[in-house]
């Protein structure tokens, strides 16, 4: 548990953004993160905009922040960005008590999650000329 032994270093064509303590379970948040993994940044934003899941708004904010970091801090071309990593991790769990019948009680767990989004600039693909 805890942090990995070696932190992941970003290359020159990458930018990232974090969100800590998102009020959603990691399992539900990962469903939305799977939607955007490997997609172009514009396409991922469109998917999140029209997603019916409540947590999609939080993921969209983090993705927009990663895109802004790429543009302003790393001078990357926004049109060539894609989501290379979207990582979901467990954060704290709040324990609550729910009163039940006959003097009993039930434990309610309110899960929190962390989200990391890394965007990468696509490399220039060599243009192949048609052989005549």
Swiss-Prot record:
GO CC terms in record: cytosolic large ribosomal subunit
Entry keyword set: Ribonucleoprotein, Ribosomal protein, RNA-binding, rRNA-binding
Superkingdom in the source lineage: Bacteria
InterPro entries: Ribosomal_uL22, Ribosomal_uL22_bac/chlpt-type, Ribosomal_uL22_bac/org-type, Ribosomal_uL22_CS, Ribosomal_uL22_sf
GO biological process: translation
SUPFAM superfamilies listed in its UniProt record: Ribosomal protein L22 (SSF54843)
GO terms for MF: rRNA binding; structural constituent of ribosome
Functional summary from the UniProt entry: This protein binds specifically to 23S rRNA; its binding is stimulated by other ribosomal proteins, e.g. L4, L17, and L20. It is important during the early stages of 50S assembly. It makes multiple contacts with different domains of the 23S rRNA in the assembled 50S subunit and ribosome.
Protein name: Large ribosomal subunit protein uL22
Organism of origin: Rhodospirillum centenum (strain ATCC 51521 / SW)
């Amino acid at each position: 548990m805890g942090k990995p032994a070696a932190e992941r270093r970003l290359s020159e064509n990458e930018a990232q953004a974090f969100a800590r303590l998102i009020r959603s379970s990691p399992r539900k948040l990962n469903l939305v993160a799977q939607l955007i993994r490997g997609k172009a940044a514009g396409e991922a934003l469109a998917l999140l905009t029209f997603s019916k899941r409540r947590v999609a708004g939080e993921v969209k904010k983090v993705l927009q922040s990663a895109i802004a970091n790429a543009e302003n801090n790393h001078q990357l071309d926004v049109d060539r960005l894609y989501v290379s990593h979207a990582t979901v991790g467990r954060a704290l769990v709040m324990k609550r008590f729910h009163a039940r019948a006959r003097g009993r009680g039930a434990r309610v767990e309110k899960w929190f999650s962390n989200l990391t989004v890394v965007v990468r600039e696509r490399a220039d693909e060599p243009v192949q000329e048609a052989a005549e």
